[in-house]
């Protein structure tokens, strides 16, 4: 019974997240340029990839809010961390910015020693998040 309740809560939560995505993502694309990408909602990255030892992985490797996969062109939002209107909008702005960036250069800069905290493309994506209030429900 608990498992069913958890699953129902997850479905409701994911539907709420999807409704924010449906409302704001087209405007984000219009404002920033580029093309709309598919957006998928999962509880967390580790469940998405069917990992074993999820709690250990979260502690050791983190638990991101969202990510963009340039190989399949999908933006992933993780409901465990991205579940408020602000979180969703910020994540969409951040990840859509990555869809506009040169992915070979993105990887090259990481290979050269940049990390999440100082990578120029991450800094650009973080700056894009600052405009999140433009998209919130008034």
Residue ranges of each PLM-predicted region?
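A metal-dependent hydrolase signature that marks the N-terminal structural subdomain at the beginning
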Residues: 1-60, 73
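Acidic-residue sensor for enzyme active/binding pockets
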Residues: 10-13, 95, 122-124, 129
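Short, solvent-exposed loop/turn segments at secondary-structure junctions
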Residues: 46-47, 82-83, 106, 133
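Active-site scaffold of zinc-dependent metalloenzymes
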Residues: 52-86, 103
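Short alpha-helical catalytic segment bearing the HExxH-like zincin motif
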Residues: 76, 87-96
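Post-HEXXH active-site segment of zinc metalloproteases
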Residues: 86-90, 102-131
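Long, well-structured alpha-helical subdomains associated
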Residues: 131-138
């Amino acid at each position: 019974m608990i498992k069913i309740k958890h699953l129902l809560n997850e479905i409701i939560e994911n539907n709420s997240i999807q409704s924010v995505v449906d409302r704001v993502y087209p405007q984000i694309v219009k404002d920033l340029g580029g093309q709309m990408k598919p957006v998928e909602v999962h509880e967390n990255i580790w469940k998405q990839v069917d990992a074993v030892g999820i709690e250990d992985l979260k502690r050791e490797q983190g638990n991101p809010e969202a990510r963009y996969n340039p190989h399949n062109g999908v933006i992933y939002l993780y409901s465990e961390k991205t579940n408020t209107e602000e979180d969703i909008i910020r994540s969409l702005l951040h990840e859509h910015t990555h869809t506009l960036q040169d992915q070979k250069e993105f990887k090259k800069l990481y290979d050269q020693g940049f990390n999440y905290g100082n990578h120029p493309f991450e800094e650009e994506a973080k700056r894009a998040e600052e405009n999140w209030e433009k998209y919130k429900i008034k």
